[in-house]
Structures are given as structure tokens and as C-alpha cells.
Swiss-Prot record:
<dbReference type="InterPro" id="IPR041424">
    <property type="entry name" value="CinA_KH"/>
</dbReference>
<dbReference type="InterPro" id="IPR050101">
    <property type="entry name" value="CinA"/>
</dbReference>
<dbReference type="InterPro" id="IPR008135">
    <property type="entry name" value="Competence-induced_CinA"/>
</dbReference>
<dbReference type="InterPro" id="IPR008136">
    <property type="entry name" value="CinA_C"/>
</dbReference>
<protein>
    <recommendedName>
        <fullName>CinA-like protein</fullName>
    </recommendedName>
</protein>
<dbReference type="InterPro" id="IPR036425">
    <property type="entry name" value="MoaB/Mog-like_dom_sf"/>
</dbReference>
<dbReference type="InterPro" id="IPR001453">
    <property type="entry name" value="MoaB/Mog_dom"/>
</dbReference>
<dbReference type="InterPro" id="IPR036653">
    <property type="entry name" value="CinA-like_C"/>
</dbReference>
<dbReference type="Pfam" id="PF02464">
    <property type="entry name" value="CinA"/>
</dbReference>
<dbReference type="Pfam" id="PF18146">
    <property type="entry name" value="CinA_KH"/>
</dbReference>
<comment type="similarity">
    <text>Belongs to the CinA family.</text>
</comment>
<dbReference type="Pfam" id="PF00994">
    <property type="entry name" value="MoCF_biosynth"/>
</dbReference>
Amino acid sequence: MKTSKEITINKKNKFGAEILCIGSEILLGNIVNTNSQWIAEQLAILGIPHFRQTVIGDNPARLEEAILEASNRSEILITTGGLGPTPDDITTKVIADTFKTPLEQRNDILIDLRNKSKDKDSKLSDSQKKQSLVPKGAKIINNYSGTAPGIYWSPKENFTILTFPGVPSELKEMWAKEASKLLISNNLSKEVISSKVLHFAGISESLLADKIPHLLISKNPTVATYARTGEVKVRITAKGENSEETNRLIEPIKKELTQITGLKCFGIDNETLEEIVFKLLLKRKETIAVAESCTGGGIGSKLTKIPGSSKIFHGGVIAYNNSIKQRLLGVPEEIINTHGAVSKPVVESMARGVQIKFKVNWAISVSGIAGPTGGSKSKPVGLVNFCIKGPKTLITWEENFGSNKTREDIQKLSVLNALDRLRLSIIMAN
């Protein structure tokens, strides 16, 4: 799998891509527009700069105006929404009208619609057939999960439109299987933009930025930091005449970053913490089990999303109730009564118990107060205790993620913190 992507960018007056999301339900705030964020991430992965995101309601005149404006300033316009059989699905027709191009009915789309119809013997309705109309000369972006296909079309010089349905799962599948490949293969110039993303844990964005001020002012490659819950990303982006040149520019920056930050850097491009933990345990031929309270199985869920995780993950106990901690994990009642469920002695006992129960090399336990209620002056919301028990390792620690965080944030931070400490513990055990 490629760890950096590239695409050529035209050097004429127009530059980059923009995103246009269509639908009155987005404009009115009835649904959250996650498509723009996801497309922006994909453009960054491909190395395509983008400078504008717009939301337009289901209004033909305003939609045509937005499309015309985009065609005069950008090379690529990506739209979501407004594809389908209903009257407010106007995107394809408005695009065709904007560039004075007739719509043509595509037999291949009609066949696909019939195959996807529940009643294959009945005739398609006019509203269903509407989805088979595309601007003359446009390529089809097949919809594998839904009925409305998208288009890939260059209606004028140095301008390409890609359309997608508004359903996120359909958009993502169409992008992965066809659209991203079309963007990469249809080169527009000899200039190449390549990027590589480094992932960091256990360090804040500001502290990381303080360590690399000389890199952040670099022009080619550019270096930028991005903070996410429990993680910081650094994107290195380079321009050149070919991928060999851009990779030569990126490599020394990447090397310097990892030297400065050491083990704080846990992955590159699409690597996740749980994948790194999985690979480390697999290499050592070791196994793990989890005992979770406030995270509700979040650590186990992360690990079991990885194909083949049964080779290293034996199981877990979600011990939310104190009686379960005692009965299934063997935590002594007196320890809970003396120290409280959220304490280092309790998580140590949980880790020992789950390690014995599942006969594994490694065990990790967590107990905390995720809120918004249940906190006290001595044990506030956001306080979480952890333990890692390995073949020759025993670590307990406490984190206070803050009472201003949401329950979901505290759970997510706890899971990521646990996985990162586990990663470091396994590395140190080598």
C-alpha cells in the first residue's frame, strides 16, 4: 500500500479544488455536513490543494451561480448531494444547463438500476429513470451501494467536475474505488505535490511546535501541525517535477522530525496506534487481554477491528460494576472499600486478574470517572487510572483529562492513552 499519494496540478491561473455541498437540509442545520471534512482530508492525502467549501440549498439559480464561479477560479469542483430520483435532486440537470450541454440517457445506468430494483420484472418509474440522465460526454462514477451514479466531466478547458451522492458511505466507496484513481491518472501538468503524515501521541501540538520552529517555516517542503483528540499530526508536503524529487525533499524532514521526537512518533500516513500495538505483539508472538470500566470496551474494540487480531487478542472483561470486578477479576472487596474503584490498587488488581483469567502475556486495565456526574473533590470527573501488566512489566499511572471534557472525549482519550502506553511498554520490553 502506498504511504504517500501524489497528483499533478496545472500551473495556469486557476488552481486547486473546491467543495460544493448541495442540500437545503445541510443549509438549515438539520444534518451535520461531514462530507466536506472527509473530502478535504482525501484531497490532502492526494496532495491536491483546496481553498473553498460552499453549501448551497436546493435552488437551481443559486446552484448554477456557484458552479459558474467555481469554474472560473478552480481546476476541480467536487459536489455532494442532489443526486437521486426525487424532485429536489437537481445537481446533474443544473450542471448540464450551466454549460449548455444536453442530457443523454445511459443504457448502462438503466441496466444497473433494474438490477438493483427489488422488483426486477416491473418497469422503472420516470423518477428512477431520471438517475440515468447525464451530460453528454461525461464519464460515470459508479455507485456500488446506492442507485444514483456520479459523474467525472470536463465541460470546459482546465475545469473538471466530480459529483457524488450525499450519503457518506456511498461517497466514500465511490471515491476509493474510482474517483481517486481518476484524479491521479488524469495528469494536468508536470508539477507534482506529494505529502506524508506523521502521527504523534503523548505530546501536545504546542509543545511539538516548540520543538520544530525551524521546520514550520520551511517553504518546500511545507510542514504543518494538526491536533486531534489524543493525537497530533504533522503533514510534510513537497512540490517537484516528479515523485522522486518530492520524496527526496520529504525524507530528510521526516528523518529530522523522528529524531527530535523519538518514540512520540508512532506511525506514518494511515497507521493507527492499535495497528502498531498489533504488529508489535504479533512480532513477539505474545497475547493480550483487557479489563475495562469507564471505557466500556473501547480498547478491545480498537484492537478487534484489525483483521487477524485473534492471533494476539484473547478477550476482555467490561467490569463496570464493583461486584463484577470482584467476581470475574478477583479484585478484593477491601481494596475497593479502602481505595475506591478509581484507584491504582484497583486497576493493578484488575490487570492481574484478567491476565490470569485469559492466560495472556499482557494485560491492560482502566477505571475512571467519565462524567458528567459521579465526580468528587478528591476524584473529579476526568480522573482515570490505568495499569499495564506484562511478562516483566508492571506500570500503574493516573491521568486527569479535565472536568470540562465530554464523556465521549474522556473515554476516547483514555483509550488512546492506554494504547500508547502499551505500545511504549512493549517496545521497552524488547
